[in-house]
Amino acid sequence: MARNLDPKCRQCRREGEKLFLKGEKCFTDKCAIERRAYAPGQHGQKSGARLSGYGVQLREKQKIRRIYGVLEGQFRLTYKRADSRKGVTGENLLSMLESRLDSVCYRMGFGASRTEARQIVRHNGIVVNGRRVNIPSYQVRPGDVVEVAEKSKAQLRIKAAADATATRGYPEWIEVDAKALKGTYKAHPQRSELPSTINESLVVELYSK
Protein backbone atom coordinates (compact mmCIF):
# COMPACT_ATOMS: atom_id res chain seq x y z
CA MET A 1 0.00 0.00 0.00
CA ALA A 2 1.28 3.46 -0.94
CA ARG A 3 2.34 5.74 1.88
CA ASN A 4 4.37 8.86 2.53
CA LEU A 5 7.93 7.83 3.39
CA ASP A 6 9.26 11.34 4.06
CA PRO A 7 10.74 11.62 7.58
CA LYS A 8 8.06 12.90 9.96
CA CYS A 9 10.16 15.68 11.47
CA ARG A 10 11.11 16.88 8.00
CA GLN A 11 7.43 17.18 7.11
CA CYS A 12 6.81 19.39 10.16
CA ARG A 13 9.76 21.60 9.32
CA ARG A 14 8.52 21.92 5.75
CA GLU A 15 5.20 23.26 7.04
CA GLY A 16 6.87 25.43 9.67
CA GLU A 17 4.75 24.12 12.55
CA LYS A 18 4.14 21.04 14.66
CA LEU A 19 1.93 18.49 12.93
CA PHE A 20 2.24 16.00 15.82
CA LEU A 21 3.36 13.10 13.63
CA LYS A 22 5.88 11.52 16.05
CA GLY A 23 3.82 10.89 19.16
CA GLU A 24 5.35 11.86 22.50
CA LYS A 25 8.47 13.36 20.92
CA CYS A 26 6.32 16.23 19.63
CA PHE A 27 5.54 17.25 23.22
CA THR A 28 9.20 17.48 24.27
CA ASP A 29 12.13 19.78 23.53
CA LYS A 30 13.48 17.06 21.22
CA CYS A 31 10.92 18.10 18.61
CA ALA A 32 12.65 19.20 15.39
CA ILE A 33 10.60 22.41 15.25
CA GLU A 34 11.96 23.39 18.67
CA ARG A 35 15.52 22.83 17.52
CA ARG A 36 15.41 23.96 13.88
CA ALA A 37 12.40 26.12 13.12
CA TYR A 38 13.19 26.50 9.43
CA ALA A 39 12.58 24.51 6.27
CA PRO A 40 14.75 21.44 5.59
CA GLY A 41 17.38 21.33 2.89
CA GLN A 42 20.53 23.22 1.99
CA HIS A 43 18.76 26.56 1.66
CA GLY A 44 16.20 26.03 4.41
CA GLN A 45 17.33 28.94 6.57
CA LYS A 46 17.31 31.29 3.60
CA SER A 47 13.91 30.31 2.20
CA GLY A 48 11.89 33.49 2.55
CA ALA A 49 10.29 33.64 -0.89
CA ARG A 50 6.65 34.67 -0.87
CA LEU A 51 4.23 32.10 -2.22
CA SER A 52 1.62 32.92 -4.84
CA GLY A 53 -2.06 32.53 -3.99
CA TYR A 54 -2.03 29.10 -5.58
CA GLY A 55 1.13 28.22 -3.67
CA VAL A 56 -0.50 29.14 -0.35
CA GLN A 57 -3.54 27.01 -1.18
CA LEU A 58 -1.40 24.07 -2.22
CA ARG A 59 0.75 24.33 0.90
CA GLU A 60 -2.33 24.29 3.14
CA LYS A 61 -3.68 21.21 1.37
CA GLN A 62 -0.34 19.45 1.84
CA LYS A 63 -0.30 20.39 5.51
CA ILE A 64 -3.76 18.95 6.15
CA ARG A 65 -2.89 15.79 4.21
CA ARG A 66 0.21 15.33 6.34
CA ILE A 67 -1.63 15.91 9.61
CA TYR A 68 -4.14 13.17 8.82
CA GLY A 69 -1.75 10.92 6.89
CA VAL A 70 -3.92 10.84 3.78
CA LEU A 71 -2.58 10.39 0.25
CA GLU A 72 -3.66 12.66 -2.61
CA GLY A 73 -6.21 10.27 -4.11
CA GLN A 74 -7.84 9.60 -0.74
CA PHE A 75 -7.87 13.28 0.09
CA ARG A 76 -9.50 14.28 -3.20
CA LEU A 77 -12.15 11.58 -2.80
CA THR A 78 -12.87 12.74 0.75
CA TYR A 79 -13.20 16.31 -0.51
CA LYS A 80 -15.70 15.26 -3.20
CA ARG A 81 -17.80 13.48 -0.59
CA ALA A 82 -17.60 16.49 1.72
CA ASP A 83 -18.67 18.78 -1.12
CA SER A 84 -21.71 16.62 -1.88
CA ARG A 85 -23.00 16.87 1.71
CA LYS A 86 -25.18 19.59 3.13
CA GLY A 87 -23.37 22.28 5.08
CA VAL A 88 -20.02 24.02 4.72
CA THR A 89 -17.68 21.99 2.51
CA GLY A 90 -14.50 22.82 4.42
CA GLU A 91 -16.02 21.93 7.77
CA ASN A 92 -17.46 18.74 6.29
CA LEU A 93 -13.97 17.84 5.07
CA LEU A 94 -12.38 18.23 8.50
CA SER A 95 -15.24 16.34 10.12
CA MET A 96 -14.76 13.41 7.73
CA LEU A 97 -11.00 13.37 8.33
CA GLU A 98 -11.52 13.41 12.10
CA SER A 99 -14.08 10.60 11.91
CA ARG A 100 -11.68 8.23 10.12
CA LEU A 101 -11.10 5.23 12.36
CA ASP A 102 -7.34 5.82 12.57
CA SER A 103 -7.90 9.42 13.64
CA VAL A 104 -10.53 8.45 16.21
CA CYS A 105 -8.18 5.82 17.67
CA TYR A 106 -5.44 8.44 17.90
CA ARG A 107 -7.75 10.90 19.66
CA MET A 108 -8.80 8.16 22.10
CA GLY A 109 -5.16 7.41 22.90
CA PHE A 110 -4.92 3.97 21.31
CA GLY A 111 -1.84 5.10 19.37
CA ALA A 112 0.86 7.69 20.08
CA SER A 113 0.37 9.13 16.59
CA ARG A 114 -2.05 8.70 13.72
CA THR A 115 0.57 6.58 11.99
CA GLU A 116 0.78 4.22 14.95
CA ALA A 117 -3.01 4.15 15.29
CA ARG A 118 -3.25 3.27 11.59
CA GLN A 119 -0.88 0.33 12.07
CA ILE A 120 -2.92 -0.96 15.01
CA VAL A 121 -6.12 -0.74 12.96
CA ARG A 122 -4.56 -2.57 10.01
CA HIS A 123 -3.25 -5.33 12.27
CA ASN A 124 -6.77 -6.15 13.48
CA GLY A 125 -6.23 -4.44 16.81
CA ILE A 126 -9.47 -2.42 16.90
CA VAL A 127 -13.12 -3.37 17.40
CA VAL A 128 -16.07 -1.12 16.50
CA ASN A 129 -19.46 -1.96 18.00
CA GLY A 130 -18.23 -5.47 18.76
CA ARG A 131 -16.92 -6.14 15.25
CA ARG A 132 -13.28 -6.06 14.20
CA VAL A 133 -12.52 -3.35 11.63
CA ASN A 134 -9.13 -3.13 9.90
CA ILE A 135 -9.80 -0.27 7.48
CA PRO A 136 -8.15 2.99 8.65
CA SER A 137 -10.47 5.14 6.50
CA TYR A 138 -13.62 3.58 7.99
CA GLN A 139 -16.00 6.39 8.93
CA VAL A 140 -16.94 6.27 12.61
CA ARG A 141 -20.45 7.52 13.36
CA PRO A 142 -21.82 9.25 16.46
CA GLY A 143 -22.66 6.65 19.08
CA ASP A 144 -20.13 4.10 17.83
CA VAL A 145 -18.12 2.31 20.51
CA VAL A 146 -14.45 1.85 19.63
CA GLU A 147 -12.12 -0.33 21.67
CA VAL A 148 -8.82 -2.14 21.50
CA ALA A 149 -9.22 -5.83 20.65
CA GLU A 150 -8.63 -8.16 23.58
CA LYS A 151 -5.54 -9.71 21.98
CA SER A 152 -3.94 -6.27 21.57
CA LYS A 153 -4.59 -4.81 25.03
CA ALA A 154 -1.30 -6.16 26.38
CA GLN A 155 0.79 -4.18 23.87
CA LEU A 156 3.04 -1.79 25.78
CA ARG A 157 2.90 0.88 23.07
CA ILE A 158 -0.90 1.02 23.35
CA LYS A 159 -0.78 1.25 27.15
CA ALA A 160 1.85 3.98 27.00
CA ALA A 161 -0.14 5.99 24.45
CA ALA A 162 -3.35 5.59 26.48
CA ASP A 163 -1.67 6.80 29.68
CA ALA A 164 -0.09 9.81 27.95
CA THR A 165 -3.33 10.84 26.25
CA ALA A 166 -5.31 10.46 29.49
CA THR A 167 -2.87 12.85 31.16
CA ARG A 168 -3.31 15.47 28.42
CA GLY A 169 -7.08 15.05 28.20
CA TYR A 170 -9.54 14.20 25.45
CA PRO A 171 -11.53 16.25 22.94
CA GLU A 172 -15.14 17.03 23.82
CA TRP A 173 -16.56 14.83 21.07
CA ILE A 174 -15.29 11.55 22.52
CA GLU A 175 -15.59 9.77 25.85
CA VAL A 176 -12.88 7.32 26.89
CA ASP A 177 -12.34 4.71 29.58
CA ALA A 178 -8.53 4.62 29.50
CA LYS A 179 -8.26 1.56 31.74
CA ALA A 180 -10.62 -0.49 29.58
CA LEU A 181 -9.08 0.94 26.37
CA LYS A 182 -12.58 1.70 25.18
CA GLY A 183 -14.30 4.86 24.00
CA THR A 184 -17.45 6.30 22.49
CA TYR A 185 -17.52 8.69 19.54
CA LYS A 186 -20.22 11.00 20.89
CA ALA A 187 -20.56 13.42 17.98
CA HIS A 188 -18.77 14.88 15.00
CA PRO A 189 -16.49 17.71 16.19
CA GLN A 190 -17.57 21.32 15.80
CA ARG A 191 -15.24 23.58 13.84
CA SER A 192 -14.48 25.57 17.01
CA GLU A 193 -13.14 22.38 18.61
CA LEU A 194 -10.53 21.81 15.90
CA PRO A 195 -7.14 23.56 15.51
CA SER A 196 -7.37 27.19 14.39
CA THR A 197 -4.04 26.74 12.59
CA ILE A 198 -5.88 24.81 9.85
CA ASN A 199 -7.40 26.96 7.10
CA GLU A 200 -9.66 24.56 5.23
CA SER A 201 -11.16 27.36 3.13
CA LEU A 202 -7.89 27.48 1.17
CA VAL A 203 -8.43 23.85 0.15
CA VAL A 204 -11.97 24.66 -0.97
CA GLU A 205 -10.61 27.53 -3.07
CA LEU A 206 -7.97 25.24 -4.57
CA TYR A 207 -10.39 22.50 -5.60
CA SER A 208 -13.02 24.98 -6.80
CA LYS A 209 -10.80 26.20 -9.63
Curated annotation (Swiss-Prot):
Keywords: Ribonucleoprotein, Ribosomal protein, RNA-binding, rRNA-binding. One of its GO terms (cellular component) is small ribosomal subunit. CDD domains: S4 (cd00165). One of its GO terms (molecular function) is rRNA binding. SMART domains: Ribosomal_S4 (SM01390), S4 (SM00363). Pfam families: Ribosomal_S4 (PF00163), S4 (PF01479). SUPFAM superfamilies: Alpha-L RNA-binding motif. GO terms for biological process: ribosomal small subunit biogenesis; translation. Part of the 30S ribosomal subunit. Contacts protein S5. The interaction surface between S4 and S5 is involved in control of translational fidelity. NCBIfam families: PRK05327.1, rpsD_bact. This is Small ribosomal subunit protein uS4. The lineage of its organism: Bacteria, Pseudomonadati, Pseudomonadota, Betaproteobacteria, Nitrosomonadales.
